[in-house]
Amino acid sequence: DLVRSRGLGDVYKRQVCMVLSALLLMKNSGEEIIYVVNTGYQSMDSVRLADGTKVMLNAGSRLTYPKEFSGEKREVQLSGQAFFEVTPDKTHPFVVKTQKMDVTVLGTSFEVFSYDGDEEGETVLLTGKVKVEVLESNQQKGGSYVLKPNEKLTYSKTDGISLTTIDADAYSSWRQGKRMSFKNETLEMILERLEKWYGQKIECAPHIARHYRFTFTMHSESLLSLIHISEPTRPY
């Protein structure tokens, strides 16, 4: 049966909606089995790849990966948000390919946020070193960037590419369970994350969304309750 559900434990069993499908792709050397994992709204899932790499997928994400890695690189494709703990292998770099950027590592832990169709994407590094290749488009020039721990690269169709220093562990705390932590983040960025988690469109005037910043941590609150969670830290 190619369609089934699984969870991360009893806490998630009722809310995790995951579809696992196997696609057979014919190649000259024979058949290669490709797996596609999709997570539903308000759900997460974990995947262990053939090389031992651990991947945690957040809500509304899709990961495509081979049953076995072959060739010079270990390549996977991502649309969404995922945290990677990559098994070191200097002779076979690990590459996460997205619609906006390619992230190459040898062995490290990092997060990629890049949904197909969105105008923004991020890479956050916790440990080790990664090289981010931002893909060139009609609206944005590409480029190559090497990140150090606690650095975040942000790609924006309107604002270009930026590098900032953050607390990467806190920023990626969603992987520890149904929890998201925001520290002095713009309302615009927060609403984007909440839309992905709850699967609902949240409308807010652009001049307000970009004007205020919030600091708070959410666990498994309803979307309605989050409306009253915090006062803005200050406009900038």
Residue spans of the language-model regions?
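Short, well-ordered junction/capping motifs at the entry into regular secondary structure
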Residues: D1-L2
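A residue-level detector for the "anchor" residue at the start of short, highly conserved motifs
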Residues: R6, D10-S230, R234
